[in-house]
Amino acid sequence: MRILLAAAECAPMIKVGGMGDVVGSLPPSLIKLGHDVRVIIPGYSKLWNLLEVSSEPVFRANTMGNDFSVYEAKHPIHNYVIYLVGHPTFDSGHIYGGEDEDWRFTFFASATAEFSWNCWKPQVLHCHDWHTGMIPVWMHQDPEVSTVFTIHNLKYQGPWRWKLEKMTWCPWYMHGDHTMAAAMLYADRVNAVSPTYADEIKTHEYGESLEGLLNYISGKLRGILNGIDLNEWDPDKDKVLPAQFNIKNLESRLENKIILQKEMGLEVNSKKYLLGMVSRLVDQKGVDLVLQVSRRLLAYTDSQIAILGTGDRSLESGLWQLALDYPGRFSVFLTYDDSLSRLIYGGSDAFLMPSRFEPCGISQLLAMRYGSIPIVRRVGGLVDTVLPHDPENNSGTGFCFDRFEPIDFYTALVRSWEAFRHKDSWKSLQLRAMSQEFSWQRSALEYESMYKDVCGIKAPSPDIAEIEKFSYGQSADPSLKTM
């Protein structure tokens, strides 16, 4: 099949969140299955310094009253084709934000549609998040191109209908309330990035006011778990780590722990229980829970906590105060550092992910791969990837809690600390976690199956009368038919 992935990010060149990992890492696994897979992204100015870009465009056209050009490049690691949509709107230096963000990504979506019709025509056009949400609307009229839309984070939904009408001249019934709704209505298949998240977003608690629409389209909705690049993330070959290790020489991992303690200003003692966290410091990630339980945990146990990330100023301030109050036991680096993040994965004893919601989550997969035991809230992709530790049956890969409450999180932390004191059992837990298989090849087989199901097939056009029922804020109604 000819498959084109359209997105705002593609790792490693352009990456803000998990979407960049998916778009960068999924194509090579699909190519191994025999498909012609390419990616199209906005032509951010920095890319011309990071990639070898064709001197002449492969396509020129005009859309939304603006001329644009499409250039060809190759992925720097995997060597597949990447198309860059060139226009001055992408020269600002930032990926997200800015006063023209809505217009910028709607223009990118329109340019991608023009390119797909008139230059390189895919059989499947795979769109990612609201930035590409209008593509399924425009491609719906083409019987030769099937569209797939992936929801990475339902919270971000794109420009509203009045702005879309002004920018695209499409009447409201062609896109519903916003670009996220547009994509879900017109895409031939829709998937979320984990099976549990696909179920959760059909409920009021996690539906972000789109649960009614998601129940309506549930017949074409599924969940496919993200993966990780096992070659890029391999503790046995990771040159960033002071000491490489695998399941056969786990003892070497202690050297990483000692160096992590030194680098983050913690007391150097390999027997201390060291909790790590690499995260955006925002409410979604449960940082407020960390703030609420840390003092009690440090008072009751001999634990240490090492946190790396940036985000909300108030959360950063709270973490900084804890570091001042508990020198040698609590450390926070308010930045992002790839080398230090790898050291936290490869040196901490356990890894914190007390998320409010988590569409899939990559960090828990990396933590397990590197022998750091995840402590997670049972939500979204964390349910699908972390199995609760059961010492009696010698099973499980992490510690889990259900409610987003400090006492529940604290209880899970204490259980993990107590388990850490039993070295043989803890080592068995580490070995089980490190043996889990979350490769992109597994995910690629599921995406391939979905592509085959949809290739050459168009979902029925949405019923305008039904669309009217799903204005913003509409609750789910299980009696409604599904597409």
Curated annotation (Swiss-Prot):
Pathway: Glycan biosynthesis; glycogen biosynthesis. Its EC number is 2.4.1.21. The keyword Glycosyltransferase applies. GO terms for biological process: glycogen biosynthetic process. GO terms for molecular function: alpha-1,4-glucan glucosyltransferase (ADP-glucose donor) activity; alpha-1,4-glucan glucosyltransferase (UDP-glucose donor) activity. It catalyses: [(1->4)-alpha-D-glucosyl](n) + ADP-alpha-D-glucose = [(1->4)-alpha-D-glucosyl](n+1) + ADP + H(+). InterPro entries: Glyco_trans_1, GS/SS, Starch_synth_cat_dom. Keywords: Glycogen biosynthesis, Glycosyltransferase, Transferase. ADP-alpha-D-glucose binds at residue 15. Belongs to the glycosyltransferase 1 family. Bacterial/plant glycogen synthase subfamily. This is Glycogen synthase.
